[in-house]
Structure formats: structure tokens, C-alpha cells
């Protein structure tokens, strides 16, 4: 395995610290917009960084920094099955769910992991065909019309983001065969809201838990079982699919469910949308064709991320820019704004992807580090956010870099002309206007009306939000997060930070440790049972 160094030990990072940001007011030109543009996957999904505060000097140092840190070589180690997740002694194999780029990866000296993931996909595709044809019906003999996925974190956020991104596209192309719903929160009101809004007789339920013992998912699964029984469905297991590890409690102890699809512990939840975790529901709702297009887009972007030239590798360049903005310019957050209603859930997935991966304060050697790591990821959809938090982005005291995402065409192809332009033209005009306004600003002697500009942004754009495009965009961000982790010398593939709260919650629920006056006082105020 290659050597890792802390970010502040890398010679080219020390050089980068002395480089001032580019002045966007004067730098942003038509020529720059044309030149500072690369494709994420090949030729249809673009990453434009013309409105980032960088120039050729930065790009040269980025290249040297990437080479010094062996970023592409480390990516190749991931693809070849090295145990990059050192704290858990695991490989990191989410790229294999959409195609093989590196060497054969053999687990436990016997199982080819690409073949394992492919066989699970084929099982999913065949199962979906049986559901769609009506060969498999509900326990009461009805054809399934709905799918509800029950899971939390990566078992919900990524799949939900992809589902909402593709739903209208599938509808327009007659590929929307079932309705999808999600239950994640342990709040029983969410379960009741979803289950009371559908006919459970016509609904297939997907239970996703890697360990088979996730607190929230177990509780929501029991809520579901109770609801099915109340609706006279005695053979409820015939309407439930399990997605879990082969050796989990759900797989070993819980028998008789309609079908089982298996995850692998080499893929963390936030990197699992292109595994059974995401593709089961997506195939059921939108067909095998859509699922394969998502995988194709992701795989093509994975390949492009192997390019050593930072000017031809969007995910690598985005990671280097992110490090510069966070660790040199001290920008503490990043805002994701998609000018597409279909992508309203996407920033929530990216929030988990980046903050759970790189929200660490120790390096790969379990040593405390003394530089900044992940930025706060947040966002929304345009143009809605222009009327909420854009005031702060334009004139607030914090500079917040932004990622804009936009598409030339709509998914449903319905529009209206108002004031001599279509709604979609207005949407795109607002996207372009915001990038320019944030970059160039506008001087005014009235300070209240002055726009300083110099607010950096990147633009991801394509002709249309298709399954292929969303697959490529998903891969772009996954690989960006991976490269950032390499530079920061942290393990992007564990999540110890989620454990402590779980332990204390279990203590409270079991009435343990009530010699702790803090637990007891909070519990008496909030939990009626105490």
C-alpha cells in the first residue's frame, strides 16, 4: 500500500498556502468559461469551474500536489481491492457494483467480488420482471403497485435522491411501473403517514439493514408488521424483501421472506446507491433499463476519474479546489443548488456522503490532526432558494462556495410561454444570472445595495437529467470525496462518530446508568415514561 502523509506535510500544499485567489471580477471572460470546462464522464455531463477563484498557477500546483500525494495511484489501489478502510480492515468496493476497472478482487480467497455484485443485480432484474408481470403477487393475490423502502442513512438518502431525480424522466418515457416511498425516521408519524396513504394490499416492502440490527429500521419494520396484521394480512412476509449482509441476523434467523438480496461489508451505506440498496427499488419502479443506465453513467465517470491530468479529471479537480477553499481560503461550508425540482433530495445525500466520510479529526494512523477537514454541506433547489437564503450568500459576512447543477431540457417536456419566454428559459436564465452575480458582483455607493462579488461557484450541467447523467454526477461526488480523504490523510470509509449517541440512547431505553444525573434529568423532562 502507498504511503500517506498529512496534508500540511505535503510540499506542494505548503506552496499552495501562499497563492492568492484569482479575482473573478476581472478574470471571468467568455474565453475562460469555454476553456475551464471538462466532462465528468466522456462527452455529455460537464463540470465548469470558470467561476472558481483559481487560475493556471493554481492548476499547476494542483497537478504537482496530486502527483506528490499519489492520488490516482491510491484510487487504483481502491479499484484493485486493497484494504483502504484500515480502521475496519476492509476493502472499498462500491466501484465494482457498476463495472470492473481494476484487477480481479477476490474475497476470502474464493469469491470474485465483481461476479458477486453482478449476480445480485441479475437476481434483482429477474425478481423485478416477476413482479411486473404479475407472476409474483401480494399475499392477498393482488398485483403490486407500490414499493416502500424502510432503512435509514445510506439505506435511504442515496436511493431516495436517485428515485426523485429519475421519477419524471421514467414517467415521460413510460418506464414508471411502480410508485416508490421511503420510511427512514424512527418517528412513528412518518411510518403512519406513508402507510396510511397507500393500499398496503398492493405494496411491496423493502427492508434494508446492513447489520440486520439497526434500531430505527427494526422499530419501523415492527410498525409495518403491526399495520399489515391490522389490515388482515397474515402472511406479511410474502410482501417483504430483505436487503442485508449474508451473515446478518436478518439473513440467518429471519426466514420465509419473499426474497433476499445481499450487500457486502466492503460498501458503506453512503456509497451504496449503485448496489442492491438502491437498485432494488429503482429497478422495481423504473425497470432494468433505467438501472443499467445509472450504472453506465457511474462507470464511465469512474473511468474518467483515473485520468492523471487534473484538467481532464473533474472529480480530482473538484477535490483539489475544495481543499484550497477549505484549508487555504478558510471557507467553512459548501452549498449545493440544483436548478431542477427533481434533484430536491440530492444535496441531502451529498451531505451524508461528504460529512460522514470526511468529518474526522484523526488521520489514518489514529493521530490528531491540526488542520481543517470537511466543510458543512447544505443546499436546496433553484429558484426557490433565491427567495430564502441567497440574501446571505450575496451580502453576508461569510463567503460560501457553491455547486450549481442545471439542465438544458426539462424531463416532462411541458411548458408555458409567459412574458415572451418559457418557464424553463426563465429557470436557466436565473441559474446563469446567479453565477455571474456571485462572481462579479455590482458596486453601488449605497452600501446596502453593494454586491462585493468574489463568491466562487462551479457548474455541473448536461442536456437533460437522465438516468445516465445522474449516475455520472453521483460518481463525480463519490470520487471527489475519496480524493479529498486521500489529501486529508483520513479514512473516508468508517463512521465512528455515529456510535456514542446510539450507546447513550440504549442506556436510556434500558434504564441503565441512571446514577448519571444528566441522563436522569433530561429523561424526566422529555420522556414521559421516566
Curated annotation (Swiss-Prot):
Top-tier EC class: isomerase
Biological or metabolic pathway of the protein: Carbohydrate biosynthesis; gluconeogenesis; Carbohydrate degradation; glycolysis; D-glyceraldehyde 3-phosphate and glycerone phosphate from D-glucose: step 2/4
GO molecular function terms noted in the UniProt entry: carbohydrate derivative binding; glucose-6-phosphate isomerase activity; monosaccharide binding
Cellular compartments annotated: Cytoplasm
Cited Pfam families: PGI
GO biological-process terms attached to the record: gluconeogenesis; glucose 6-phosphate metabolic process; glycolytic process
EC number: 5.3.1.9
Alphabetized UniProt keyword annotations: Cytoplasm, Gluconeogenesis, Glycolysis, Isomerase
Superkingdom of origin: Bacteria
Cited function: Catalyzes the reversible isomerization of glucose-6-phosphate to fructose-6-phosphate.
Protein name, as recorded: Glucose-6-phosphate isomerase
Provenance organism: Borreliella burgdorferi (strain ATCC 35210 / DSM 4680 / CIP 102532 / B31)
Name of the encoding gene: pgi
